[in-house]
């Protein structure tokens, strides 16, 4: 939908605008490996967003951004230690809004949180790890709830926009959509 595309575009724009200065800073301070990671993240995110915008593949684009953002936050956490863990919180929230497939976002987010905790390089001690697990788990649950509620409300509003409130019959909007689909199918079949 157009709303999903706008989320993808805004994510791409703000990711590039915010991560790019960090990449420059990393190179200037001698953290070349992290600077390269940041540069690769910005480049890949920008390319994926342009693809989604050009071809209208918002769901595929959103899923790919979930993977890229999460893995980028994971690698950043591993390379920078506890300072990099803060990027994981951004990834957790973004994951539930970049794709309408909430199950995919849930599974991938959970896997990345557990993987970060298992590797343990990001945390100085067990207390930090358990604190991260508690806060990231809570944030993931709350993000899931908000994304699920948003999806339900969007579906309800779409249903209301498609039906006549008095009769419950489908309205002109549905007819135009069905006519468009019929014309496309007719063109494909060549009849």
Name every feature range the model reports, one short phrase each:
Residues 5-82, 89-93, 111-114:
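Hydrophobic transmembrane alpha-helices and their membrane-interface boundaries in multi-pass
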Residues 92-103, 140-148:
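Short helix-perturbing small/polar motifs within transmembrane alpha-helices
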Residues 98-116:
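The cytoplasmic-loop to transmembrane-helix boundary for the fourth helix
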Residues 127-135:
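Loop-to-transmembrane alpha-helix initiation sites
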Residues 134-161:
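Juxtamembrane or sensor-core-proximal signal-transducing alpha helices
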Residues 158-180:
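Conserved nucleotide-binding and Mg2+-coordinating catalytic segments in signaling enzymes
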Residues 178-191:
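Active-site-proximal structural segments of metal-dependent nucleotidyl cyclase/transferase enzymes
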